[in-house]
């Protein structure tokens, strides 16, 4: 998976135009086409994030959803993440809206949640704690009425190239 972050659609357009007409862009595509086949491309826009945004978070739980009630999802996440039980949440959580390319690897999606951690051990330890909280149980009730999960995967960053942007810039 290649994830490219842009601060705006205008910046994305500028970068793509520059890349498409360059020898570096052609070289990258030549190599990429030998080792990978694109299966999906989509554009997302962050709605809100919780936790501490950090480029050190390289292990992600990526959850694709078909949301029927975005306001309930946002309010439910706000309530859960602001609860006293989750005050020591070690990672970061992002709720994003899928603007284009809503057919994901699993099925149709309107939104995604990304939950980032510095390690899989941190993810595992926090999940064990989270699943025992009242806040999580309440969130499950809201979630079951507001969306269907269409795909879920664990994503581990192999390398991050930050072209004058870091994840913290998108907070």
Show which residues each predicted segment covers.
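Short S/T/G/P-rich N-terminal loop/turn motif that feeds into the first structured element of a domain
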Residues: 1-171
């Amino acid at each position: 998976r290649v994830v490219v972050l842009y601060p705006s659609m205008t910046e994305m357009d500028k970068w793509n135009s520059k890349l498409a007409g360059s020898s570096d862009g052609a070289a990258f595509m030549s190599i990429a086409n030998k080792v990978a086949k694109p299966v999906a491309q989509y554009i997302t826009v962050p709605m809100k994030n919780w936790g501490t945004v950090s480029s050190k978070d390289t292990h992600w739980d990526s959850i694709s959803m078909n949301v029927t009630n975005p306001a309930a999802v946002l309010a439910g996440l706000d309530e859960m993440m602001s609860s006293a039980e989750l005050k020591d949440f070690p990672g970061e959580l992002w709720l994003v809206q899928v603007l284009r390319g809503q057919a994901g690897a699993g099925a149709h999606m309107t939104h995604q949640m990304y939950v980032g951690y510095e390690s899989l051990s941190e993810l595992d330890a926090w999940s064990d704690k989270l699943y025992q909280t009242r806040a999580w149980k309440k969130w499950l009730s809201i979630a079951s009425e507001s969306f269907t999960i269409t795909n879920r995967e664990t994503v581990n960053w192999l390398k991050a190239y930050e072209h004058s942007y870091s994840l913290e810039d998108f907070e």
